[in-house]
Amino acid sequence: MASASQGADDDGSRRKPRLAASLQISPQPRPWRPLPAQAQSAWGPAPAPATYRAEGGWPQVSVLRDSGPGAGAGVGELGAARAWENLGEQMGKAPRVPVPPAGLSLPLKDPPASQAVSLLTEYAASLGIFLLFREDQPPGPCFPFSVSAELDGVVCPAGTANSKTEAKQQAALSALCYIRSQLENPESPQTSSRPPLAPLSVENILTHEQRCAALVSAGFDLLLDERSPYWACKGTVAGVILEREIPRARGHVKEIYKLVALGTGSSCCAGWLEFSGQQLHDCHGLVIARRALLRFLFRQLLLATQGGPKGKEQSVLAPQPGPGPPFTLKPRVFLHLYISNTPKGAARDIYLPPTSEGGLPHSPPMRLQAHVLGQLKPVCYVAPSLCDTHVGCLSASDKLARWAVLGLGGALLAHLVSPLYSTSLILADSCHDPPTLSRAIHTRPCLDSVLGPCLPPPYVRTALHLFAGPPVAPSEPTPDTCRGLSLNWSLGDPGIEVVDVATGRVKANAALGPPSRLCKASFLRAFHQAARAVGKPYLLALKTYEAAKAGPYQEARRQLSLLLDQQGLGAWPSKPLVGKFRN
């Protein structure tokens, strides 16, 4: 995969069939929903301490047959340069999900037949593997029933018995024995007279979109169980997955996927503007997940600068020389977005075809749209008086288009980290139009007709690989109790934060709860702490949120807004008064 900061154009040579086979959304994804993660005790010994601490007890997907350094845990609360090593003990450990690394053992050497099916189902669910029991032709009259287990296309030896239940148990035992043999001696040659089974590898165990969905689902299940009043918020869940490649011998690459941010929600705050920076405006799941990613990245800066040699190794950020930002995403580290619902705005407006000339459609559906007073409307129809007094948020489709150009990092982080671009977007909503989604992200504004450089370096438009992903949301409709709530979490947080969308603050029994950890004021504090840790004291003189926005980022944003307006799509709203607060 190409470096996430270089766009998607350079990654064709690295992409295996897992990702390269689908550069646009498939119209009919296979339905799939992983089961909730189970307790660690069901899986025997815990992983080695060094490995477990590095991962913080959170789900990851690892491939090939050995272990390696993880993507780096976050450091506790912002400003504390210590790894959060005990989250697993606080929240209940879940089985790690490598496929299959050394040291990962199955629960029992010879499990009872009555437990084999449940153990195999549990193991497959933790990996996100598609498990299928299928009835085969019986081998003879002595054993009238024959059942085999299939793990994502890998057919294990069949189990035969006098009843279908016993045959299924024997098939599960055969599958567990096969997996154990792969764990204990993955390089051993096949000695059986049967045809050799396909090796457990990234290509035939889990697709890219399935792995991302598995992590989002397992992460949510670790934070909340089905008895929680907030369980139904999973219907709008979005996540950010970090992929890390580790080179191996003979050209092989080990890939580790880790969930680093979660968000849920389906609406925006519709009240009056506040000017303290303590109000969370946009509470859609994708936007919240991206803000949670920023919190994770501020932690990674502290980990890289204050965590010692181990922190530098674990952090996903690395120092870079030159006059630009002092840090960048490490090589072979990539970001992926997972969303449950089609982004509101242009990506949902599919009733008008593109122009016959093949250029950018200037029709109303492709215009910028804003949420104001509970309604979504084109920005050109929003009165200036409303923009200056009420909360207004551009649609998720518009923000995806902006992130494809400016990156996910935002204006504050741009001082410290080079632009961070997502490599792929996994959409788990089958009711969408793939070409419309692609146009909404990649053609607004149109850059092909612009003469000369239209964006200051290092900003460029990047192309996201688009995938139809398996849904992980509950099948039941979201109850009204969750419609006005938004949940957020990032790697390093002790648990979920629940935000009341109506107030833009943490949900509380009182009329007004405390400010969210994702609000602008929290990020300004995090920015000053990171600037001090990185050794950029001049940034501490930028006292207000508006002043702390990086100049090159602001210039690129201004150019982007100008192009959008010139092409009839509307100008990006600007609210400088909202950022005049100080900590």
From Swiss-Prot:
Q: Which UniProt keywords are listed?
A: Cytoplasm, Differentiation, Nucleus, RNA-binding, Spermatogenesis
What GO cellular component entries does it have? cytoplasm; nucleolus; nucleus
PROSITE patterns cross-referenced by the UniProt entry = A_DEAMIN_EDITASE, DS_RBD
Principal location listed in the UniProt entry: nucleus
State the gene name recorded for this protein.
ADAD2
The answer to whether the entry has keyword Cytoplasm is yes
Region entry Disordered, spans: 1-48
User: Could you tell me which residue ranges the A to I editase domain spans?
Assistant: 261-582
Q: What family does the Swiss-Prot or TrEMBL record give for this protein?
A: Belongs to the ADAD family.
Taxonomic source organism: Homo sapiens
So what does this one do? Required for male fertility and normal male germ cell differentiation.
Highest taxon, organism lineage = Eukaryota
Keyword RNA-binding in annotation: yes
Gene Ontology MF terms: double-stranded RNA adenosine deaminase activity; double-stranded RNA binding; tRNA-specific adenosine deaminase activity
Compartments, as annotated in UniProt: Nucleus; Cytoplasm
Pfam families on file: A_deamin, dsrm
State the Gene Ontology BP annotations.
Answer: adenosine to inosine editing; RNA processing; spermatid development
Using the record's annotation, list all stretches that form the DRBM domain.
115-181
Q: Which SUPFAM superfamilies match?
A: dsRNA-binding domain-like
Protein name as catalogued: Adenosine deaminase domain-containing protein 2
